[in-house]
């Protein structure tokens, strides 16, 4: 018994000993697995906290105290930087290419440099303090030139109480060991061309780009037009070049320059007179060739300053986010082709904040994968200010397609989520992104391959940050798991083998970490409670140590912690075994449907999730491996000289070939481009070979120099509609045939393709405001649209079939995504309620909303020049909305209804209207007055308030038909029919004052036809010049029915009209049979044209007119007429060819083409000297009847299309004629040395008695008539106003109720009264007002002083002007003392004083001239003084400028029309 007990004792003892040893071992193991930490206190949060690349050295910059701290052991211990005085540092900048160097900048001229990663610091001196920009230093990327650095500083010259400052850039070649030398003054940014490892090019190693001003400034301000991009290869010693960007002298207004990935990008503001603030981007990939970035929807995607962001881009695509609506924080993401020039829409409604940051980030190291947030309720946000609802989208193919994030099926506790993951519209994962940053560095990913984390929520849209949870993806975003409840900061370490998170919603005293890719989590207590502010590690995520930045509440602070702490977390002891080869796996990126991108699959070597080991490859970035894929169609793009047309690439013209390949044999072939090329950088092999050369006939090759070529295409049916896209860079034309088929040519008629043969097309529309958009209307509710000039056509659904009531189907808006569709509703057979219904879309037809039913016409009130509510819609709407609309008569009147907020707030404006129209800045409504059975003309300048038009006696519209004519010179032109039916029609032209309310007689007996069209045409490019035909025999024509027409021209906007001066001899040198004062030139006008686009003049050739007519007493029949030309805006004419011809201008007038318009022909005539000599080109053996000659709308191309038909063949033919090889020399335009270029200066006033036109003498550039060169697409030189002229009689017209008598003087019409006098001028700050006379100044004239027949007796304006100038100067300066105190307070509070964390960005202090001096100060004056000070300032400026030497009067701006008192809204805001 005792032995048994002893045995049991021994067994128990051994078991006890074993358990004791086991517990000790477990304790030992557990002790080894625990991380360790150290805590270092600081006074303030850092402005910068960073590691030197691939080192353990770190920098902590406290900008509040102005101190720099250094750690040499990954943040375990910290010490103040040796060699830098306390409290001096305002900025720390590390060298991006040399990890030994960093620079501590002060606000003085003395700064500090380390070349040993912060161990020691030495001072250096520069001539000026640093500029207030985000990065005042630029570095060279070449290891041999890492000492080359550019430094931007600010130089100031004190003047009185203030200082005049400008920025200067200095350079050093030895990292400031040498004396910095001045590079360039008046700069806003300079950068080495070699400053990015991805921007690879062969340029000079010292090439530098600078955005600087080409003029110096006394007061520190500059005109934006003086900002240019300069370059140099010798630090501006002898080499100083202005980068012309391929646009010559127009490369001005440069806002910014940046190098992004492999692209250099320049942003400049379009300073052309017609521009409305658009920004232009120019891109280069080789520093030699710059190209303009082309966006698919021209107007909609206009870049505006502070309204676009170049986001993170790849080496094969540039990405830009553009704000399409004013004052919006919603954008559209565009991605480019491989050379960064042609962009396509990638993602709509992207979320961005007011600072321009966009919710878009690419996953690090994984090609093609990116995350973005979109605003799912964009319409409500922009329409009624609703709160944004954000959804997260992901792309795996570089932005080509986007999908929702599929959520996990379970939460972090294993419970099923509350929605169905299969329904991604209502149940998807959404993540907080760039606009709400919650850590340093990248938002989602790190260099750890394939790992991504985020804070977000599952559901229909993103929840607020403090209601979100933490998620992880280990396969680059394909799948996600919830790893922690609540929002956390997160970081990856040891190439992803360690994950660390810390609570980011509240204070905490611990962190969580995972060693198995987030499957399980361990807790580690820190020992103090803090609020996490940042969590970071080495930039390459290869370390096992982390830095946790925390803020400690006052109640939790101790003497060892302070209010800010840096906690180093060391996980190096948690695992003892280093991973070996068997612990790794091959991980392929993008395991979604699209594994290949840019021709290869991408894979990394990554630790297996369950491997219990550490990677330990510190400072070694993950190595990317590529497996090449077989080539597919996605690996190719259009070759040079080819453009996309649907699924094909078609040539823009004949292909250039090497000399000697084609020897003249018509059947000979050559190896030419297929139209495709492999995308540069693409590595695919085998598979589809779209870039192989193909056999082509030599007849298709580019002709030899001097030769003309043609190509004929047969259409089986008649052409009923054709039009080019308006974009001058695009050569695409659309054609619709009688059989309802659509055809397209992307190379100016050289080749043709049919668009969607399976559909019948009723019409097509080009977008009025977007040069790249067009819409094809079918006979169903399907329509097609393009946003890239026809390269792709997108199918869309309309809310209804197109209407059959004769109304325009589509109406457009300057915001190009806004559309109005008018279609049929309930119009099936035997329908009793068939009517027209209008709906609007704000997303280019994706979604539609009802406007109104039973309408005849609905349109946007907003127009390019009509300044109305952009969301207002105007409708002609029937009062009674029932029954069949086709049967409506006058008993159901048509009302005019306007509705703001997209017709939500409707308002009936008129009870009975005939219709409305928009012309220039005028909205015109024809109102029916049933009780008087008459018409009233109502005019509005804002779409809300209307004024009734006032007409001379006997010319009121109540008894006459009228036509509103083209109006572009701040006045309305109206043709009012004066003849009675059924006699031939003619009438009077009336012209309004500048607000469209008072109409005066301009010309009597002007011809019109039975359709209401008028022989009236304004000249393109020169305002105020117009041609008309008048009926010279109105009395006889009433009886005989035969009108005799004569032509008239005006050069002062209708004030006076003269006959056209005939040439002395005809085109054969013979004198005309008609002689004497009754003989004049008469030309056929608008009413006789088959194509109304065949205008007398061209937008590309200022001053040139062509017409068909005759010299005689009256106009002869068309077939008895000849062809005439004027080069001086109609002052003189010459006959250029016998017989009537169609004509077209090409290459800005260097080519003029004629085709016989009297009979079929087999040839054309062309001239290269504007009609002095003619040559013939035969293009067919069988004669054709030419119906029209067309070229691109800008008339800058050298290719033409003849549309017509053969005599014995049904259908139509299109003849493409190419003059590109006729002349090879490009015209030289030199505004600096005009005597030696190919252009001459010309003024419209050269051949007229008066020197000036509209009160100014203007000079234009035009090509010398007989020079042999091609103008091409080079930018035209701007016109130049030489001087503003003194007013003369031609600058005035008759006042309302006045007409000219036989002495050419204005007199009051008998039985009428003149307008009452008005002191309106006093509202504009004038000192005097004048009584009315019989004359008024033509609104478009800018003349000054001189004769003023419009001014009667002078009266002094009442009010403020009775005080002296010195009184108002004193009143103006009085508030400045208070302003200085307020300004000083805001200086201390705003961050401009040293000691704040935030530093201004590059755009923080613009150097461009704007509101400077006193005007800028007015913004700080207390509100109750602004009214008085503003009036005083206006008075002071007007008088000081009048006295200042060299002051210019310039153009007068009349914000209130001189006749404004007739408007019912004159005193309304």
Curated annotation (Swiss-Prot):
Membrane-spanning residues: 1365-1385, 1413-1433
Keywords per UniProt: Glycoprotein, Golgi apparatus, Membrane, Protein transport, Receptor, Repeat, Signal, Transmembrane, Transmembrane helix, Transport
Pfam families with a match to the protein in the record: Sortilin-Vps10 (PF15902), Sortilin_C (PF15901)
Superkingdom, taxonomy of origin: Eukaryota
UniProt family annotation: Belongs to the VPS10-related sortilin family.
Signal peptide range in chain numbering: 1-31
Gene name of the record: VPS10
Positions on the Cytoplasmic side per record topology: 1386-1412
Entry keyword Transferase: no
Record membrane topology: Multi-pass membrane protein
Protein name: Vacuolar protein sorting/targeting protein 10
Residues bearing carbohydrate: 339, 995
Subcellular location: Golgi apparatus, trans-Golgi network membrane; Prevacuolar compartment membrane
Main location per the UniProt record: Golgi
GO biological process, one term: protein targeting to vacuole
InterPro entries recorded: Sortilin_C (IPR031777), Sortilin_N (IPR031778), VPS10 (IPR006581), VPS10-sortilin (IPR050310), WD40/YVTN_repeat-like_dom_sf (IPR015943)
Residue spans of the BNR repeats: 69-80, 112-122, 393-403, 471-481, 512-521, 784-793, 839-850, 1049-1058, 1166-1175
Stretches of the chain found on the membrane's Lumenal side: 32-1364, 1434-1469
GO CC annotation, single: cytosol
Keyword Signal found: yes
Purpose of the protein: Functions as a sorting receptor in the Golgi compartment required for the intracellular sorting and delivery of soluble vacuolar proteins, like carboxypeptidase Y (CPY) and proteinase A. Executes multiple rounds of sorting by cycling between the late Golgi and a prevacuolar endosome-like compartment.
């Amino acid at each position: 018994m005792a032995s048994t007990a002893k045995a049991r004792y021994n067994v128990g003892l051994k078991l006890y000993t074993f358990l004791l040893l086991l517990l000790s071992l477990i304790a030992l193991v557990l002790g080894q697995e625990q991380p360790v930490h150290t805590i270092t206190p600081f006074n303030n949060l850092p402005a910068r906290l960073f590691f030197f690349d691939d080192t353990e050295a770190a920098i902590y910059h406290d900008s509040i105290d102005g101190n720099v701290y250094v750690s040499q052991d990954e943040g375990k211990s910290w010490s103040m930087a040796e060699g830098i005085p306390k409290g001096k540092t305002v900025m720390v900048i590390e060298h991006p290419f040399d990890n030994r160097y960093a620079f501590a900048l002060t606000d003085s001229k003395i700064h500090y440099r380390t070349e040993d990663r912060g161990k020691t610091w030495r001072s250096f001196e520069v001539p000026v303090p640093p500029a207030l920009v985000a990065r005042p230093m630029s570095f060279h990327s070449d290891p041999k030139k890492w000492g080359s650095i550019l430094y931007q500083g600010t130089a100031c010259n004190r003047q009185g109480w203030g200082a005049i400052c400008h920025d200067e850039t200095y350079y050093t070649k030895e990292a400031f060991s040498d004396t910095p030398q001045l590079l360039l003054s008046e700069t806003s940014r300079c950068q080495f061309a070699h400053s990015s490892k991805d921007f690879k090019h062969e340029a000079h190693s010292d090439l530098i780009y600078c955005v600087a001003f080409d003029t110096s400034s006394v007061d520190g301000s500059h005109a934006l037009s003086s900002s240019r991009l300069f370059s140099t290869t010798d630090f501006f010693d002898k080499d100083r070049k202005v980068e012309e960007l391929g646009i010559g002298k127009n490369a001005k207004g440069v806002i910014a320059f940046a190098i992004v990935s492999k692209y250099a990008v320049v942003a400049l503001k379009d300073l052309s007179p017609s521009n409305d603030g658009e920004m232009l981007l120019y891109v280069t990939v080789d520093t030699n060739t710059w190209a303009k970035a082309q966006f698919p929807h021209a107007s909609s995607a206009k870049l505006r300053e502070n309204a676009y962001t170049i986001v993170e881009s790849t080496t094969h695509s540039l990405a830009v986010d553009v704000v399409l609506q004013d004052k919006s924080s919603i954008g559209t993401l565009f991605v480019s082709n491989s050379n960064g020039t042609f962009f396509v829409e990638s993602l709509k409604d992207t979320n961005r904040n007011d600072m321009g940051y966009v919710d878009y980030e690419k996953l690090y190291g994984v090609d093609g994968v990116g995350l973005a947030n979109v605003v799912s309720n964009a319409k409500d946000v922009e329409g009624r200010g609703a709160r944004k609802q954000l959804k997260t989208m992901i792309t795996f193919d570089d932005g080509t397609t986007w999908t929702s994030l599929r959520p996990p099926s379970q939460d972090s506790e294993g419970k099923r989520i509350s929605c169905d993951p299969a329904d991604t519209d209502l149940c998807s994962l959404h993540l907080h992104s760039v606009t709400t940053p919650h850590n340093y560095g990248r938002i989602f990913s790190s260099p750890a391959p394939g790992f991504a984390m985020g804070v977000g929520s599952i559901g229909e849209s993103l929840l607020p940050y403090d209601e979100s949870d933490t998620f992880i993806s280990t396969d680059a975003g394909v799948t996600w798991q919830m790893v922690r409840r609540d929002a956390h900061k997160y970081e990856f370490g040891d190439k992803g083998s360690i994950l660390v998170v810390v609570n980011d919603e509240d204070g905490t005293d611990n962190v969580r970490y995972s060693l198995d890719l987030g499957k399980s989590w361990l807790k580690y207590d820190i020992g103090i409670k803090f609020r996490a502010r940042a969590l970071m590690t080495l930039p390459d995520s290869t370390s096992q140590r982390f830095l946790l930045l925390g803020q400690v509440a006052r109640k939790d602070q101790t003497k060892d912690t302070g209010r800010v702490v840096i906690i180093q977390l060391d996980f190096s002891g948690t695992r003892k075994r280093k991973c070996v080869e068997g612990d790794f796996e091959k991980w392929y990126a993008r395991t979604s449907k699209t594994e290949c991108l840019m021709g290869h699959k991408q894979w990394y070597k990554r630790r297996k999730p369950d491997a219990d080991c550490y990677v330990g490859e510190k400072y070694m970035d993950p190595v990317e491996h590529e497996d090449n894929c077989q080539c597919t169609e996605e690996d190719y793009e259009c070759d040079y000289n080819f453009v996309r047309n649907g699924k094909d690439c078609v040539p823009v013209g004949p292909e250039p070939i090497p000399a000697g390949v084609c020897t003249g044999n018509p059947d000979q072939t050559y190896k030419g481009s297929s139209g495709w090329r492999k995308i540069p950088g693409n590595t695919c092999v085998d598979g589809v070979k779209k870039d192989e050369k193909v056999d082509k006939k030599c007849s298709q090759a580019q002709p030899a120099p001097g030769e003309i070529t043609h190509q004929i295409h047969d259409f089986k049916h008649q052409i009923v509609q054709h039009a080019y896209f308006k974009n001058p860079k695009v050569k695409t034309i659309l054609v619709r045939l009688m059989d309802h088929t659509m055809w397209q040519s992307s190379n100016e008629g050289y080749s043709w393709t049919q668009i969607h043969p399976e559909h019948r097309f009723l019409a097509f529309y080009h977008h009025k405001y977007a040069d790249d958009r067009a819409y094809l209307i079918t006979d169903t509710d399907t329509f097609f649209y393009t946003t890239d000039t026809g390269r792709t056509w997108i199918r869309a659904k309309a809310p209804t079939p197109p209407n059959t009531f004769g109304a325009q189907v589509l109406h457009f808006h300057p915001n190009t995504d806004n559309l109005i569709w008018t279609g049929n509703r309930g119009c099936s057979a035997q329908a009793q309620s068939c009517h027209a219904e209008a709906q609007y879309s704000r997303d280019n037809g994706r979604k539609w909303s009802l406007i109104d039913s039973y309408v005849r016409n609905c349109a946007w009130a907003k127009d390019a020049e009509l300044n109305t509510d952009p969301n207002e819609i105007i409708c002609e709407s029937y009062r009674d909305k029932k029954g069949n609309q086709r049967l409506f008569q006058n008993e159901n009147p048509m009302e005019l209804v306007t509705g703001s907020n997209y017709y939500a707030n409707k308002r009936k404006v008129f009870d009975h209207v005939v219709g409305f129209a928009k012309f220039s800045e005028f909205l015109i409504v024809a109102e029916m007055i049933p009780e008087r059975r008459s018409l009233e003309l109502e005019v509005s300048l804002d779409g809300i308030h209307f004024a009734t038009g006032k007409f001379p006696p006997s010319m009121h519209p109540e008894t006459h038909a009228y036509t509103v004519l083209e109006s572009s010179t701040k006045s309305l032109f109206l043709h009012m029919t004066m003849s009675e039916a059924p006699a031939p029609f003619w009438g009077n032209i009336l012209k309004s004052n500048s607000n469209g309310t008072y109409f005066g007689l301009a010309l009597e007996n002007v011809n019109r036809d039975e359709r209401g069209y008028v022989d009236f045409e304004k000249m393109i490019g020169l305002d105020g010049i117009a041609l008309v035909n008048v009926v010279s025999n109105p009395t006889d024509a009433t009886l005989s029915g035969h009108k005799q027409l004569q032509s008239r021209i005006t050069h002062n906007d209708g004030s006076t009209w003269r006959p056209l001066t005939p040439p002395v001899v005809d085109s054969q040198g013979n004198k005309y049979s008609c002689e004497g004062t009754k003989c004049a030139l008469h030309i056929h006008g608008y009413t006789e044209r088959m194509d109304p686009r065949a205008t007398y003049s061209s937008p590309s050739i200022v001053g040139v007119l062509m017409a068909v007519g005759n010299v005689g007493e009256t106009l002869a029949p068309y077939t008895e007429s000849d062809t005439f030309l004027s080069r001086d805006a109609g002052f003189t004419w010459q006959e250029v060819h016998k017989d009537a011809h169609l004509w077209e201008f090409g290459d800005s007038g260097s080519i003029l083409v004629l085709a016989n318009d009297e009979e079929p022909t087999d040839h054309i005539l062309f001239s290269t000297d504007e009609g002095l000599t003619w040559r013939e080109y035969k293009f067919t053996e069988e004669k054709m009847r030419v119906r029209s000659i067309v070229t691109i709308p800008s008339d800058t191309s050298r290719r033409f299309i003849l549309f017509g038909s053969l005599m014995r063949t049904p259908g139509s033919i299109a003849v493409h004629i190419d003059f590109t090889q006729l002349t090879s020399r490009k015209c030289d335009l030199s505004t600096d040395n005009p005597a030696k270029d190919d252009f001459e200066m010309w003024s419209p006033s050269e051949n007229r008695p008066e020197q000036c036109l509209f009160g100014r003498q203007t000079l234009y550039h035009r090509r010398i008539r007989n020079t042999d060169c091609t103008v091409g697409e080079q930018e035209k030189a701007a016109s130049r106003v030489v001087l503003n002229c003194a007013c003369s009689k031609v600058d005035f017209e008759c006042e309302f109720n006045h007409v000219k008598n036989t002495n050419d003087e204005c007199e009051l019409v008998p039985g009428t009264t003149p307008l009452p006098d008005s002191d309106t001028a006093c509202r504009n700050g004038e000192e005097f007002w004048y009584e009315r006379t019989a004359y008024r100044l033509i609104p478009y004239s800018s003349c000054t002083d001189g004769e003023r027949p419009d001014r009667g007796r002078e009266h002094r304006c009442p009010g403020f002007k009775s005080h002296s100038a010195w009184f108002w100067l004193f009143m103006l300066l009085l508030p400045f003392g208070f302003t200085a105190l307020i300004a000083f307070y805001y200086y201390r509070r705003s961050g401009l004083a040293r000691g704040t964390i935030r530093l201004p960005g590059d755009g923080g202090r613009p150097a461009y001239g704007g509101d400077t001096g006193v005007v800028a100060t007015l913004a700080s004056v207390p509100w109750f003084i602004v009214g008085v000070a503003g009036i005083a300032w206006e008075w002071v400026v007007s008088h000081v400028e009048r006295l200042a030497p060299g002051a210019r009067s310039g153009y007068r701006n009349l914000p209130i029309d001189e006749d404004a008192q007739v408007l019912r809204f004159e005193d309304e805001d």
